[in-house]
Amino acid sequence: MSSEESNPKQADLEIAYTRLSPSQNPGDKESSYPTIIFLHGGESCHLEFSRVTPFLTDDYEILLVDLPGHSRSKSIPFSFDNAVNALSHLIKTQVKGGKVHIVGLSLGGFVGLQFARRCSELVLSLWCTGCAPFSGYRHWLRSQSRLLSGIIFVAGRLATERIFWASLGVDPIPGLRAEVKNNQTITLLKPVFDELVSVTLENFAEIQGVRIAIIAGGKQDNVEDTVEAGKVLRSKNPECNAFVVRKAIHWWSLQLPEVFAQGVRAWVEGSEMPKVYEPLLTAVS
C-alpha cells in the first residue's frame, strides 16, 4: 500500500536545499531566470549533481534538494507524501512565479512523477531518468525490502572509498561517498523500496498536462520498461517522450554530466534533444 493511501498528509514540511543563482545584473532585485529543481537518487544527496550544474547555472535558478530521510533532510521520514508536500511548500515559498522545471534521477525521478501527478499546476516540465515502474525480477527484488535494505547496509559498510568509486567508473566527488554511507540505513531504505514497488503505469496515466521526458541509461536501466512508461505518458500528453542514452549507467549524472545537462537544457527550452538521446517512441505511439 502506498503512503498516499496509508498515511495522513502533512503540510509545510521544510526540506533542506542549496540554491545556485546566475550572476545578477546591477540593479536587479530578484532573479527572472527559470527555476529547475534537481531531485537525487536513493541513498544519495544533492551533491550527486555537482558536475551537472556548472553547465546550467548561467541561465537557470537551480535548487538542489535533499529528499526526506536523506542527509540534511534526515529528520523527515521518507515517503512519497512527505516528498510531495515538502516540494510543494518549497515551490510556493521559495520560487518566483510558483512554477518549476523538475529534474529527477532514480528515486528522484519517481518523486518527480508523483509530484507531477498530484501537483501538476506547479510543474512546467519534468525530465527524469531511471524511473520506469519495475517489472519482473527487478520488482520482486525491491519487494523484499527488509532483506535488500540489510544487504545494502552491510555492503555499504564493507566497501572502501576506492571500491565505491571504481564500481561506478567515475572520479570521486568530495563528500558524496560519506553522505551515501550515512544514508544507507534500514530506517531509510525499507520505506524507499516499499514506495518504489507501489508505483504502477496506472499512476502515470493519472498525470495531466505536464510535458515529460523519461530516459533510460542504456547500460543498466530497463529500456523496455521505459518504452512502456513513455507510451502511457504520451497517451495523456502528445508532447511527452521516452529516450535511451546507450552509453549511460544508471547513475549517469556522475558519468556523463555534460550530456546529462545538455538533455536537461533541451527539454526545458523545448528544443531538439541531443543526438545521443535516442527516441524510443514512434510518431504514433
Question: Where in this protein do the model-derived segments appear?
Answer:
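Short glycine-rich catalytic loops that host catalytic nucleophiles or stabilize transition states
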Residues: A242-A248
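Conserved HGGG/HGGXW glycine-rich cap/lid loop of the alpha/beta-hydrolase fold
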Residues: L13-K74
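Conserved alpha/beta-hydrolase catalytic His-Asp/Glu region
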Residues: Y137-H139, V154-V210
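Catalytic histidine-centered segment of alpha/beta-hydrolase-like enzymes
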Residues: A248-A261
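Active-site loop/oxyanion-hole signature of alpha/beta-hydrolase fold enzymes
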Residues: S23-N25, R51, L63-V103
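Flexible "cap/lid" loop of the alpha/beta hydrolase fold
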Residues: R117-R118, L122-V154
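Conserved serine/cysteine hydrolase catalytic core
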Residues: P191-S235, V244
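Gly/Ala-rich beta-loop-alpha elbow adjacent to hydrolase catalytic centers
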Residues: G104-G108, G112
